């Protein structure tokens, strides 16, 4: 272990600071004890094998220290190394930190997130690493230890780490921070510039930026781009835990359903703000953080107000007939399919098994994530202890400007939390990959299971080749 008593200078930009400088500015001076620092030289074996640059800390600083005198554990991602992407070693350091938290029980865990998501050069090793981080965050919360996410770095927080952020108890963002699932470059490369113009910076920040995420309810605090402001936010949010419970997730589900009902038809952040009742939404982007909080508070509360919404965002669907499912349940099943999403149950030798999942390469958007979470929560509520089979055949998250505008990463984080609640309540969860299993289509469901199995021909992968080529700058 390495001790470092350095401190961040006053009024230091969070966005421009390095990962280590952010962490040192967050924690009390002289209390930081870093684990597996650069001197340990724990590096990615995959990058070395590919002849790519390595970092001696693999792009993440993990440490323990004190925050206003209280013991905390913290991790800070380095966006300057491979865009803060998470590979096998990077992910293992985060998982180890979260497991240590459950053992030593600090005041909480603070994650300084600056990441483009899965390290594409490590492919499925990175995908599995992110799924393990997601599960570790939820297990730490379930153990009664709050996890706070801070998003204000230059790379934002995207991909699987965008879901990880929404698995935290609470999030603080700056205006400059960005949070989402599919980044603007990925959406443009996959769906075209007509769907989302990644070069339109104003549009990108209206869609992903801290101001929109604050009104939407995806961020709990909006702060200035200042290390000290993020430190104060961490102190405040550690005192506002959201335990993983049936009541907490039921309320979160109602809020997400109300958001979809109210803002589902909006095409731009200004439209969302207008629907929420914000006065002069066009001028909100021009305000500083303090003025924005004052002007947008009413809209934030209005958008978060619970209301009467449809319980079935996809409809009831129709009976699902599939030889593979018939073979799994020769005694019969009542599984129904709607827009490629499966819900129902099957009769096994040991009793009834709940079934949720995807079929036919379905893309998972906000409606699908909400429907899957509703089914998992219904099983927990109505059928205590019933085993849960998560079937996955999905080309991943639906890549659209609308889904990112609504915060699809938050809907998928909610689904992951619902699966974790089922596990905590004694439901055995088994994931079965039957076809494509891509990114957001597998992370919050299949990879959250107690056991994950794959049928012959199943194809877990990270991202479409054109988008990977654009992000990595490596020709497809």
Language model segments and positions:
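Structural beta-sheet core signal
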Residues: 111, 149-151, 355, 390, ...
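A structural preference for long, well-packed, hydrophobic secondary-structure segments
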Residues: 142, 358-386, 417-427
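N-terminal short beta-loop-beta anion/metal-coordinating cradle
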Residues: 51-68, 333-349
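Amphipathic alpha-helical segments at domain termini/boundaries
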Residues: 1-36, 188-342, 470-476
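STAS-typified acidic loop motif
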Residues: 67-91, 345-369
